[in-house]
């Protein structure tokens, strides 16, 4: 269990060192210095920053913290320094010696900004003293070509406003022509609607007359049996006439009655 805690502690220290990226060093004026050196030179000892800044002379300078390591709070070009006790007992500023850290590519900071006008000229290609350029005064108005190049971007709303202002008045003749064209277009539309309505009504009327004519032709060409109802047939009645006068019958031979030949019995 103790071994696990030791591994965790060492790993956390390594992660913190990598996070700071200095490995116990700090950057100052483009150089890497050790941050835990309490001596500016052999045989000397740095005073605590808070204790050394107790005097009125050093209160105006920022305090690096509650320690006695070499720092550079006032950005001294000579590098980090610290306060030491002088012969009179007054804190004295003393630059630190042999404070450099071994610089590596991984610890190298971004390139510092150029500190002189010469470096700026070399970087951005600005001509030096050999080539002198004459600039117009600040209050001078630009030329037409320059003004056209420096014009701001015009938005949609500004374009709409400009176009509305640039409209020209067509005059009375323009208004008359506009009204005339409007009336002509309306008349053409009304004529198209009326013509379509008349044509449609005429077609419907012709279709109706054609249907009536077809029905009449069908009625004429039908047979007679189509007009009779077989359930209501009329039967012809025959009249029989009976007369009371009988015509005498011709007596033929052999057709007389037996009574005539034999006579009455007992006669």
From Swiss-Prot:
GO terms for molecular function: endopeptidase activity; phosphatidylinositol 3-kinase inhibitor activity; signaling receptor binding. Disulfide bonds join 25-101, 46-82, 70-96. Residues 24-101 form the Kringle domain. It is found in: Cell membrane. Residues 91-122 are annotated as: Disordered. GO terms for biological process: negative regulation of phosphatidylinositol 3-kinase/protein kinase B signal transduction. The chain crosses the membrane at residues 173-193. InterPro entries: Kringle (IPR000001), Kringle-like (IPR013806), Kringle_CS (IPR018056), Kringle_sf (IPR038178). GO terms for cellular component: extracellular space; plasma membrane. Residues 91-101 have a biased composition (Basic and acidic residues). This is Phosphoinositide-3-kinase-interacting protein 1.
